[in-house]
Amino acid sequence: MLPLFAIWEESLNWGDAANRVLIEAMSHKRVVNVSPHLNKSRRLVSLPKNLLRVLLGQPIYVVVGSILAWADKDSVVWGPGFISADERLREEPKQILAVRGPLSRDIILSQGFNCPQVYGDPALLFSKIYPREPYPTYDLGIIPHFVDYEYAKRLYGAEKSVLVIDITSGIFNVVDQMLGCERVASSCLHGLVIADSYRVPSLWLKFSDKVIGRGFKFRDYYSSMGRENIKPFIVTENTRVKDILGAFTPHRINTKLRDELWDVCPFKTGGLGV
């Protein structure tokens, strides 16, 4: 069976690693990463497969993450976004089915390219392929971006009511740990997205200025959910757990958005699951 072809950053970071899991679970096909950003040895391995893709006229799927700027004329775009307001497409993709949010769409439209008004990070659909129920044993789960992990661990690692979750500790492990928390606060976008997927209350945290993009990807995602003007809760050395818990406000998950994103998935088949 011919595999599917996609591009993503090869890393342990949840949003990057989720590409393979999501695409293979939804398509029941193997997926090959043909990103030009792979290291030399991985590029050499993927090169013959990419040549086969070109010969057969197969598209390259661009799915989860702030990798929309990587898309080219062979790309089918389903759900990624830009990492900052300064990024642009290099050329018009073969097809754009959905993007992460309205801010990414506005950039595409400003370039004179077509982009449907269909939004959502595909990780919102993770609960479809890995259905699990929450079992809260911690008052709060903190999911820092990997650049903030050591700092967050130092601040809150000793708190018995708090679980500090390593976003690079494995796709399913992160989800399982998150489901053990009553609420989730995260400086990592996909910590917030997977919380929404499983309907766990969430809060955007900011530990530092190390997360690149000046908050663009967070605002892009939140605007797709109809949540405008959301700002992060700033964590300092003096921020207590009760301060974070007190910053949560109720919000609804846009299930219509998830349904529309699912409807336009270009590689889905019947029978989900991993």
State each model region's role.
Residues 1-274:
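Active-site anion-handling motifs in enzyme catalytic cores
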